[in-house]
Regions:
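Histidine-rich, glycine-flanked metal-binding segment
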Residues: 40-42, 47-53, 62, 67-107, ...
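Active-site gating loops and adjacent loop-to-helix segments of metal-dependent hydrolytic enzymes
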Residues: 119-148, 207-224, 259-272, 328-357, ...
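Histidine/acidic-residue-rich catalytic or RNA/ligand-binding cores of hydrolases
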Residues: 121-124, 180, 209-211, 261-263, ...
Length: 466
């Protein structure tokens, strides 16, 4: 499998980063508007943060996700890329740069635990689609080329960062092979600006009637959704080892793929992998030190995921009682993406009389009522990156308190991705990843759609606080 094409694109971007500027994207009319993001779509490479650099942030209000409450008149002291002190009595060191957010609400940087940076249309106009036609799956990889999609990935990742998502998890490249591995490495090495990233590669799917495998230029099998095809316990183990070799953090599998709605309104989800195959994937991934996320809408495919012990089942559009019981027994979370499903609501209702979006609302509320852990995951890609902050309002609309909605993208998500000792709270020793809004998000959750300040690792990404 090829992955060097992604690095070629990254290298080209270094010289373009400081001169490329285009209008900010505008949210689809179907969604609430978000605060205007910076004009430059490609941010300049990050300045090297000196270990001796000292910053003091005066926070008029600070959300503490550990307690779900607002603290007042806090001082956050930052040295280099880490927080060294925080509290009402924290001393501001002599010579420190002081950032005045005394009229704002400061929070930990946000975490989106499920999105796709190689998907999505950064050129979206008002009311336009999130996806550029032909940019996803194997067709997209062939039509546009991996280099072009790497450019899309960088722009999308930077829009996520500018919107406040200082940490993201990319769960499948949809035909982009290992481009996200290269992007993650380029960000970590300081070549380009971007959020902290954990990434999956092309994903793995079993042969089934919903996908027809065909070769790319390098003759590696790939499904029509842009995933690697593997079958049988030995075959899936080999696929996991191969993806581990290329440097992924996660293995993404499709436990269901084809779905439809019956005339009586029930949802039918066809499983792909058997339980034995799913167990082999999980066993091999964990042996390689990788986490596993499974795409599963419901039924047998979702049951197999949970029973096999994947780290994060995703979607759960048609969540039955058996799945709820299994999730609780296994103490597993469920990432319920929302906005990605909303994009096709109208056409699905026209075709079937119902939709995944409508099923998702019921299933989300069911999982929440049962006490299943629900990290923030947007599925960004089918809709424009950087606009998923609007999902906070839906979390509240669907039953979460504002504090719970915020926690889902902070402490909850940090725990799920295994970075709870690095991000997710404003604490001594953690990365200096901060966001701020003008108002009180506990009183008005739509404040999250108006992020005004973003800091990642002690470096200010944007500051629009008046």
């Amino acid at each position: 499998m090829r992955r060097r094409d992604g690095l070629t694109a990254i290298a080209a971007l270094i010289s373009l980063a400081t001169i490329l500027a285009v209008p900010a994207i505008v949210r689809s009319q179907a969604q609430p508007a978000v605060a205007a993001l910076p004009q430059a779509w490609v941010l300049p490479p990050p300045a090297q943060v000196s270990p001796a650099q000292t910053i003091a942030v005066r926070a008029g209000r600070m959300f503490d996700p550990r307690t779900g409450t607002l603290l007042t008149n806090q001082v956050i002291v930052i040295r280099g890329d880490r927080i060294t002190d925080v509290g009402p009595n924290a001393q501001i060191p002599a010579g420190a740069r002081v950032i005045d957010l005394s009229r704002a609400t400061v929070m930990p940087g946000l975490i989106d635990s499920h999105l796709h940076v190689m998907d999505g249309n950064p050129l979206t106009a008002p009311g336009g689609p999130g996806i550029i036609p032909g940019t996803t799956g194997a067709a997209g990889a062939n039509t546009l080329g991996l280099q072009y999609r790497e450019l899309i990935a960088l722009v999308n990742a930077q829009r996520d960062l500018s919107a406040g998502f200082t940490t993201i998890v990319d769960l499948m490249t949809h035909g982009g092979w290992y481009g996200t591995v290269d992007l993650r490495n380029a960000i970590n090495n300081g070549l380009v600006q971007g959020p902290r990233m954990q990434v999956a590669g092309p994903g793995i799917v079993a042969t089934n009637k919903a996908n027809i495998a065909f070769p790319l230029i390098n003759e590696s099998p790939i499904a029509n959704l842009g995933a690697q095809v593997a079958n049988g316990p030995d075959g899936v183990r080999a696929a996991v080892r191969e993806q581990a070799h290329y440097g992924v953090d996660w293995i993404k599998i499709y436990s269901t793929q084809e779905f439809h709605f019956e005339p009586n309104g029930t949802m039918v989800n066809t499983p792909t992998f058997t339980l034995e195959e799913t167990q082999a994937i999980v066993s091999e991934a964990h042996r390689q030190g990788l986490k596993v996320a499974c795409h599963a809408y419901g039924g047998e495919g979702l049951h197999n995921c949970i029973q096999a012990g994947v780290d994060v089942p995703t979607h759960g559009v048609d969540l039955d009682d058996a799945s709820v019981k299994l999730l609780l027994e296994k103490k597993l979370p469920l990432t319920s993406t929302m906005f990605d499903l909303s994009m096709e609501d109208a056409q699905e209702v026209k075709r079937w009389g119902t939709s995944r979006w409508r099923f998702m609302e019921k299933s989300f509320k069911k999982a929440s009522a049962a006490g299943i852990v629900q990290p923030f995951g947007s599925g960004a890609g089918p809709f424009p990156h950087g606009t998923q902050v609007d999902q906070f309002a839906y979390l509240v609309k669907w039953g979460k308190t504002p504090a719970q909605a915020l926690q889902s993208a902070m402490t909850v998500a940090a725990q799920i991705i295994g970075w709870q000792d690095q991000v997710g709270t404003v604490e001594k020793g953690k990365f200096a990843d901060l966001v701020a809004v003008a108002g009180d998000p506990l009183a008005d959750i739509t404040e999250m759609s108006r992020i005004l300040f973003v800091m990642k690792g002690g470096q200010i990404v944007r500051n629009d606080v008046k």
